[in-house]
């Protein structure tokens, strides 16, 4: 739910 997930760019 955002531009980053687990330090990875979506």
Curated annotation (Swiss-Prot):
A GO molecular-function descriptor: toxin activity
Keywords, in A-Z order: Secreted, Toxin
Keyword NAD annotated: no
Entry superkingdom: Eukaryota
Keyword Transmembrane helix: no
GO CC aspect terms: extracellular region
Subcellular location: Secreted
Primary localisation category: secreted
Tissue specificity comment: Expressed by the venom gland.
Name of protein: Toxin To35
Organism expressing this protein natively: Tityus obscurus
């Amino acid at each position: 739910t955002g531009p980053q997930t687990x330090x990875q760019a979506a």
